[in-house]
């Protein structure tokens, strides 16, 4: 029926503002399309492992929001950039994260299209909010590693265009990093 994405969006907005709404909508749509997996979580008692999983998923989602922005910076989705993200997810988070990450990215691309139709600055505002949350919750070193990942996405197709460079500088500033750090990585 598609109700999970709207419920997730509303709850996400109440809990985390615009970024929370986007995250809730995307995660809710995953439940809508994959309802067999959604039922497996009922009845589980919260444990330390589920707290870690929640933190991991929160970081993974923020990372993918930023990755989607860099991938689409030049107006197209390149196979080489998507393949770079798949390899990174596989080596960092395991095979299960590859499919989950790809679904999230595809949902983010679709969400961006819808947001851009209503307000061309809406997704950019989401990126700013995401960067602010990342700056508040990650150490300098972790933010720098995330920036390296984003720069490598831009480089993965063999050419870093001006739009990608500007998007990288923008993301760096939102995450509390210097534009010079982006320039040194290119």
What do the PLM-derived regions correspond to, one by one?
Residues 1-72, 76-186:
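Small-residue-enriched hydrophobic alpha-helices in membranes
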């Amino acid at each position: 029926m598609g109700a999970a994405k709207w419920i997730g969006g509303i709850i996400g907005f109440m809990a985390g503002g615009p970024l929370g709404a986007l995250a809730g909508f995307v995660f809710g749509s995953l439940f809508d399309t994959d309802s067999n997996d959604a039922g497996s979580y009922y009845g589980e008692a919260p444990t330390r492992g589920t707290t870690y999983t929640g933190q991991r998923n929160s970081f993974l989602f923020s990372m993918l929001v930023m990755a989607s922005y860099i991938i689409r910076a030049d107006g197209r989705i390149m196979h080489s950039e998507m393949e770079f993200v798949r390899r990174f997810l596989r080596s960092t988070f395991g095979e299960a994260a590859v499919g989950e990450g790809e679904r999230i990215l595809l949902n983010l691309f679709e969400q961006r299209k819808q947001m851009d139709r209503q307000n061309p600055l809406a997704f950019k505002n989401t990126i700013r909010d995401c960067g602010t949350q990342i700056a508040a919750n990650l150490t300098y070193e972790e933010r720098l590693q995330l920036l390296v990942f984003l720069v490598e996405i831009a480089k993965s197709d063999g050419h870093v265009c001006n739009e990608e460079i500007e998007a990288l500088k923008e993301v760096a500033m939102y995450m509390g990093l210097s534009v010079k750090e982006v320039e040194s990585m290119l």
